[in-house]
Amino acid sequence: MRFVRKNENTKRYVDNIFSVVRAAKADPEAINATAGCLYGEDGKMFTYRCVFESEAKITPAQRAAYAASPAGNQEYIDLITDFVLDGRVMNHYKAMATPGGTGAIASAVNTCLDEGDTIIYPQISWGNYRVIADERNLNVLNYDVYDLNDLFKTIDEEGEKVFLVINSPCENPLGHAYPLDEWKQIMDKLNSLDKEVILLCDIAYIDYATGDPKAYFELFNEISDNVLVLLAASCSKAFSYYGQRLGALIAINNDEEFLDHYMNLCSRTARATWSNLNNAAMLNIADILKNHREEYNEELEAAKGMLKERTELFIRQARDCGLELYQSADGFFVTLKMKDNDERDAYHKRLLDHHIYTIKVNHGIRVGLCSVPLETLDGLAEKMKELY
């Protein structure tokens, strides 16, 4: 007897990341560059003091309570939306709370795509995009983030509806970011299409980018009527609050009536999927955004400075020893270039044999600079080059 649905994905699910993370934690000699979480220079998970001082004030009754609705608490929704958009979007928008950035992405996929539809995301990308696509029985098209012509060619291959995922800035795993002039070209292309276009921007790491990473949001004020922009935001990353599972989905469109309809659809899907949300986490983040922004901003700048030091050190030493990396702008990760995945697998094993724990990605090896203290990182590129 099968019992399960006929169109199930029968491939055995193995999480490539967490299995390596477990192995690293069990190895006392490990150099652990597996994590997608931010760690401090003391080797412990980085936490924002203001986040947990605020959380300590939440009562047991508040922790135990349901959120106001499947879409979340309105105060949190309003504050997180203002925080994410940063005054850049004058177009119509609506938002809802989600269980992490993954919840936002899954909600976007579940409400916009039918089985057999196509999702477009980068060739080298976060592995969970594939899991979400397979779970929904979607077709997949990929594009090269370093080649706009390849992106546009891929978009043109799609028929009646384009569902495009862009993870920028601080792309996982490459650290890639589209500059503003390329964003303008992307939006010009999407606005010119005579079909439905859903642009899903995975902005999980945006708060750790340098410069003006939200400048491209202003382009969403001049979208065509056939374009729906969805922003998937993550409190896990922004507030180093991973286990509490909180994020937001923000929808931007020219038609306010449609947005009301869309948020109703998202709320119903949420009720049928996760039912409710983390009330205490929403109360906490709302309090931080309302009453402790200055403290948060100071701690965020310290975290960004720590990441910048690590990134500059590793990239400089990789360049000096000839360890080839994909071009990186910002973020938690850098990725080594691999000729093919067979070469990648063999190299990854050599690294493991020498207690260097990293994550395999398509045609690459992801190095989580976010999780390696500067002292440990110093000289790591040379060690990895010796094993290449």
Go through each PLM region and give its residues.
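Short beta-strand
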Residues: 30-32, 232, 324-329, 358-361
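Conserved glycine-rich beta-strand-loop-beta hairpin in the small C-terminal domain of fold type I
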Residues: 300-315, 324-337, 363
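Hydrophobic "anchor" residues on beta-strands that sit immediately upstream
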Residues: 163, 198, 230
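N-terminal small-domain helix-loop-helix segment of the aminotransferase-like
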Residues: 10-100
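PLP-dependent enzyme catalytic core of the Aspartate aminotransferase-like
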Residues: 1-2, 82, 88-90, 341-342, ...
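Walker B catalytic acidic pair
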Residues: 203
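Conserved core segment of the aminotransferase class I/II
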Residues: 79, 224-304
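Conserved core of the PLP fold type I
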Residues: 61-195, 206-224
